[in-house]
């Protein structure tokens, strides 16, 4: 039965109210509160019963036949809501606004909140180490304004974006969970956004009269419209209180180191390229934070490195001080461990969803703030914490340490906080003591040893007598039979009912008073949200810097020197993640030196020798330096880069489905169009996706353009040995190679980067290592000699890559090698595989 097909005039009043609500929330599943259940009807019931594997039943609604219905217990609603959100649904909560016990007729109900993928606030449904962004995209004809916010923390950011393709990359880079946009948006762009599994809602209204402080002093009307669009959706459609929203931060091109999503992924900053997980990323290595806020802030630091030398050096100074004061630093980290997620606690307090557990977490966090403040003063930290002793004392005085999660379950408020509450509890306790004494006295009065006093919600308090004693009951005892069971009968008497009324009345009053007192205390906490958010910011940042100090000491990192001469001098540099994964194996460090006369290093050498790792480690060291962390080297001096561009690996485009070669050219184009002399370019074997001479020609032309026009620091690896001749014509290009030793046809990678170009190719040696059959290798050597004798051939060898699907099996190691996808393997994965193979041949 479809809602659109029913005769609404025949519907019951309750069901008529439901369908009227559903008309307003067509794209949303409505959970309609009825007693102890949330129920769904019509299409919603059919969809949800299928999605959650619930029983589909029916409900009388005034029609000839029952309407489809399914339901979930209200106390378990969060679990079901979470499942629906993960399946892509939006959920509206229609709550009872009146107590059914005290209401005649239909209970008043209304939508109190709408939950979607971008507006989840349930802590159990969120990753505490990740932000959960919802964004609004405002199209203004020649570009876009994007505002995005994590409503659980109140952070708000805005950015202007030039093109539709950049919009897609930005949404993916920020991992935005949901987009709100206006009708002016290009329909093709909406389709592409939806193709990335990002829900899109079209909204045409703007909130202009509330939360003005969020965009106070912002003059750009495009950004204002984007903010107002988001505020309207969250406030008016999703019924959210946004009083905790902070002033918007405008993200500008020159405010931080610019990196596109390809650079972030190629350098494996926040997730491993292959597994798409944190493990083996830079974030994974550096995250020794003690708070959830600190972990989220670290990710923000990594994705937004600084470009202001003064601010970077401020961070260095704190890290240095923490390394000097190592005992204090250890005590500080112990204090930080006691701090809960203040940012998200503020969000729940603002939304009015904070429970007693949340306020206890707030209290315990406030308890350690004076100690943290004292330690920060000792290291001359540049931001200040306000301890809020008065709020701590209020929570300490008021909230019961063992308070339940439910706000209507009682036991929320401590004894001594409210005299009225204490009196009610005393009255209730007196009544319960009477009940306990009443049972003993009745046993003595009647001589019935098997007499018990019990309670249930149907009969209240009752006297239970087992069948074997029923003959002892006489009329003068004043017992009235209420229920007969298999083994006993239950009775009431006037004295018991009189006390029952007193007890139950006082218990209801206790629960209601405790609830009201708790709400008052929670509302009092709202007054401190601004200060709490500032404290959260300070704590999250010092948590990150203490993590930097911890890993710097643990792994032997050094403080970089940031120069203005545009020179790079990094002695014995290491890739921090690869070094960590190797563990007991010896990591081979390399120098990276580029003076004022060197803009480009052209790197040659065999596959798997370490070219990509060498390039990545420069990019990662630059980013570590600009987020304020010490770096893996014996000595490091480098400039502050404004942008980093990379092309490393053979992954296809993330959104357009273009070929590898097209993506290579698009990324090269993006780099040479946008790079400045202060940028860093890392290109790994550019041009390999097309024919040899095409690729070589393009690579040479791009190198010339960078050398003559951009003149920025560039690492460019290649398998085109002919390009090494460019050192003779481009004075700012230097050749380097990754060395290897060949003995008796076997190759050993030294992973050492040396001056000059490689003297030969090792393609056939690598193919031998990969386990190609001997007859293939022998034939390849014959063909190689034929190529080398050709007069016009410029290269000494051609690296070959043949499919590894031969059936010959010689050893377990060979079989494992055959499974390796050489073109798509990451350095970390290669190291792990080599380590396992080494164990097998021991």
PLM features: what roles do these ranges have?
Residues 1-321, 330, 334-337, 341-350, ...:
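Charged catalytic and DNA/RNA-contacting regions of genome-maintenance
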Residues 28-31, 37, 88-92, 178, ...:
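Beta-sheet entry/capping signal
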Residues 33, 281-285, 297-301, 318, ...:
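A general alpha-helix detector
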Residues 42-45, 220, 290-291, 295-301, ...:
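ATPase nucleotide-binding head domains, primarily ABC-like/P-loop NTPase cores
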Residues 59-70, 157, 211-217, 268-270, ...:
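Short hinge/gating elements
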Residues 205-209, 258, 273, 364-433, ...:
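Amphipathic heptad-repeat alpha-helical coiled-coil/stalk segments that mediate oligomerization
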Residues 351, 355, 365-368, 415-416, ...:
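Charged, surface-exposed helical/loop "interaction arms" that form contiguous linear patches used
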Residues 485-523:
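Extended, charged coiled-coil "arm/hinge" scaffolds of SMC/Rad50-like chromosome-maintenance ATPases
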């Amino acid at each position: 039965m479809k809602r659109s097909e029913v005769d609404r005039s025949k519907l019951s009043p309750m069901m008529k109210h439901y369908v009227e609500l559903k008309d307003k929330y067509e794209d949303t599943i409505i959970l309609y509160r009825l007693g102890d259940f949330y129920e769904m009807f019509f299409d919603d019931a059919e969809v949800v019963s299928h999605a959650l594997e619930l029983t589909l039943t029916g409900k009388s609604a005034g029609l000839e036949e029952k309407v489809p219905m399914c339901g979930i217990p209200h106390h378990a609603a969060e679990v079901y809501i979470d499942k629906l959100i993960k399946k892509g649904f939006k959920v509206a909560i229609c709550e009872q606004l009146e107590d059914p016990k005290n209401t005649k007729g239909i209970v008043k109900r209304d939508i109190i909140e709408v939950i979607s993928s971008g507006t989840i606030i349930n802590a159990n449904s969120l990753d505490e180490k990740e932000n959960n962004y919802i964004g609004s995209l405002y199209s203004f004809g020649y570009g876009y304004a994007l505002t995005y916010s994590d409503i659980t923390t109140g952070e708000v950011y805005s950015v202007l974006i030039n093109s539709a393709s950049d919009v897609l990359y930005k949404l993916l880079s920020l991992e935005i969970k949901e987009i709100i946009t206006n009708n002016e948006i290009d329909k093709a762009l909406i389709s592409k956004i939806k193709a990335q599994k990002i829900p899109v809602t079209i909204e045409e209204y703007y909130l202009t009269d509330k939360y003005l402080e969020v965009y106070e002093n912002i003059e750009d009307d495009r950004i204002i419209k984007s903010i107002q669009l988001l505020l309207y959706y969250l406030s008016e459609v999703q019924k959210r209180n946004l009083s905790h929203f902070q002033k918007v931060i405008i993200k500008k091109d020159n405010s931080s180191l610019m990196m596109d999503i390809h650079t972030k992924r190629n350098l494996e900053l926040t997730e491993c390229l292959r597994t798409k997980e944190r493990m083996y990323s830079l974030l994974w290595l550096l995250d020794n934070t003690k708070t959830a806020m600190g972990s989220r802030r670290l990710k923000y630091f990594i994705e937004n490195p600084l470009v202001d030398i003064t601010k970077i050096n401020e961070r260095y100074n704190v890290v240095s001080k923490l390394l000097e004061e190592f005992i204090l630093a250890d005590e500080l980290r112990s204090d930080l461990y006691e701090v809960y997620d203040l940012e998200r606690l503020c969000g729940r307090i603002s939304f009015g969803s904070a429970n007693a557990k949340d306020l206890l977490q707030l209290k315990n966090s406030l308890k350690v703030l004076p100690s943290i403040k004292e330690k920060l003063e000792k290291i001359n930290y540049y931001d200040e914490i306000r301890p809020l002793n008065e709020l701590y004392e209020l929570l300490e005085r008021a909230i019961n340490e063992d308070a339940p999660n439910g706000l209507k379950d009682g036991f929320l408020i401590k004894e001594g906080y409210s005299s009225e509450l204490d009196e009610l509890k005393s009255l209730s306790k007196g009544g319960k003591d009477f009940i306990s004494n009443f049972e003993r006295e009745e046993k003595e009065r009647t001589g019935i040893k098997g007499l018990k006093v019990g309670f249930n919600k149907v009969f209240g308090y009752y006297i239970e007598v087992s069948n074997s004693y029923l003959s002892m009951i006489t009329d003068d005892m004043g017992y009235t039979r209420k229920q007969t069971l298999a083994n006993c009968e239950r009775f009431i008497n006037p004295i018991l009912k009189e006390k029952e009324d007193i007890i139950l009345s006082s218990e209801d009053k206790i629960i209601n008073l405790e609830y009201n007192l708790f709400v008052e205390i929670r509302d009092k906490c709202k007054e401190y949200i601004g200060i709490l958010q500032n404290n959260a910011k300070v704590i999250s940042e010092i948590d990150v810097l203490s993590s930097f100090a911890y890993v710097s000491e643990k792994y032997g990192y050094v403080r970089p020197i940031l120069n203005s001469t545009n020179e790079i001098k990094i002695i014995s540099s290491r890739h921090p993640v690869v070094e960590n994964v190797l563990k007991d194996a010896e990591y081979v460090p390399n120098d990276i030196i580029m003076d004022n006369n060197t803009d480009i290093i052209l790197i040659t050498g065999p596959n798997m020798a370490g070219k990509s790792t060498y390039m990545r480690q420069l990019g990662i060291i630059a980013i570590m330096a600009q987020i304020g962390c010490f770096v893996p080297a014996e000595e490091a001096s480098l400039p502050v880069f404004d942008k980093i561009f990379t092309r490393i690996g053979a992954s296809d485009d993330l959104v357009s489905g273009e070929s590898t070669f097209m993506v290579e050219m698009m990324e090269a184009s993006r780099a040479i169009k946008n790079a400045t002399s202060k940028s860093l370019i890392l290109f790994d074997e550019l041009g390999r996706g097309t024919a040899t001479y095409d690729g070589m020609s393009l690579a040479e032309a791009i190198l010339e353009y960078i050398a003559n026009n951009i003149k920025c620091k560039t690492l460019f690896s290649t398998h085109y040995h002919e390009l090494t001749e460019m050192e003779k014509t481009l004075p700012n290009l230097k050749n380097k190679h990754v060395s290897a030793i060949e003995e008796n046809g076997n190759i050993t990678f030294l992973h050492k980067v040396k001056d000059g170009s490689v003297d030969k190719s090792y393609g056939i040696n690598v193919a031998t290592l990969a386990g190609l059959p001997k007859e293939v290798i022998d034939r390849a050597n014959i063909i190689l000699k034929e190529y080398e004798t050709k007069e016009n051939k410029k290269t000494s060898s051609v690296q070959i890559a043949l499919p590894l699907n031969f059936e010959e099996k010689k050893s377990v190691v060979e079989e494992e090698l055959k499974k390796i996808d050489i073109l798509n393997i990451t350095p970390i994965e290669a190291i792990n595989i080599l380590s396992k193979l080494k164990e097998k041949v021991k």
